[in-house]
Structure formats: structure tokens, C-alpha cells
Amino acid sequence: AVIISAICMLIYIWFRFKDVRFASSAVLALLHDLLFVLTFYALARTSVGNTFIACMLTILGYSINATIVIFDRIREELRVMKRNDDLKALVNRSITYTLTRSIYTTFTTFVMVAVLYIMGVSSIKEFAAPLMVGIAGGGYSSVCITGALWYVMKTKIGGKKAAKKK
């Protein structure tokens, strides 16, 4: 289910942003988030079951939402980009514009899941603990990894057209 949802997200982002680099950066960041949570599961020796799948799918959805907000801002900035503008500055500016929103969203969601963990029964705690780890990892990856990864792909894999924009 997790692999199928990641593939569907890849296709969706590819069509929405009309650039496979957006999609591949997002999916690589999602892999980071899932490995982050998988590491938590291994270190905490938490059992893998239905809760695991639900947690992973929830983290995928949360993380891709935060990533799309940043990619949407990059796409808007690309539309108004002048020929001699620096692509690195554009990505940095886009992340800066969305940073406050990303921090508030991540913090608010984290606090609510922490309350669930504190007040919940054991089955809720089994879901909430890895979800908190995933929210923290997803917030980090959407702000710090996806934009930089897209920039590297755009400049290094983009060909002659990208080299001229540098």
C-alpha cells in the first residue's frame, strides 16, 4: 500500500508540475521520511502491523502536502523569473516565503499528536509515537531537503537549458 501510494504521488506531482524533477525530489524526500520512521520502529522495537501501515500512509500524506506547498511556490517564482535571475536564490526565496507556514503547521500537528499520545490508550500511543517522529522528519525534509534536491536535479540533470539559467 505504501509503495502504491508513493507511485501514485510520483505520477500526480509529475503531471501537476509538468516536471519529473519535482516528482522525483518529492519521492526521495518521502523515502527519507519513511526510513526515518522505520528506524524509529526498529529502535523502539515496536511491532509492525495494521498500525504501521496506517502510520506510514499518514506520514506520506502529511509530508507530501508540506512538500507541494513549497514546490508550488517555486513554480510561481519560476513563472516570474527573469532571464538573469539566480535559480539558487529563487529556491531559497521560495522556501523562505513558506517557512513560517511550514513551521506553524508542523508544530501544531506535532502538539496535537503529542496530546493524543499523552491522553490515549495503548493502541493510540502505538500510532501517535511514530507519527510524531514522522511529522518531525517530514517537516524537516519538506523544508530542508526537497528544494535543495530539486535545485541539484534542475542544475545537474537539467541539461544545457539549466546550465544557462545558472
Predicted regions and their residues:
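Hydrophobic transmembrane alpha-helices and their membrane-interface caps
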Residues: 23-75, 79-82, 133
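Internal alpha-helical transmembrane segments of multipass membrane proteins
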Residues: 1-36, 40, 106-116
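Short helix-capping/hinge motifs at transmembrane helix termini and TM-loop junctions
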Residues: 16-17, 44-46, 119-121, 154
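Short helix-terminus and kink motifs of transmembrane alpha helices
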Residues: 18-25, 69-72, 76, 122-126, ...
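Residue-level signature of catalytic and energy-coupling elements of molecular machines
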Residues: 9, 33, 68, 101, ...
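Hydrophobic alpha-helical transmembrane segments of membrane transport and translocation systems
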Residues: 92, 119-166
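Transmembrane alpha-helix detector for multi-pass membrane proteins
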Residues: 53-73, 100, 104-112, 141-147
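Pore- and gate-forming transmembrane helices of large, multi-pass membrane proteins
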Residues: 26, 83-119, 129, 135, ...
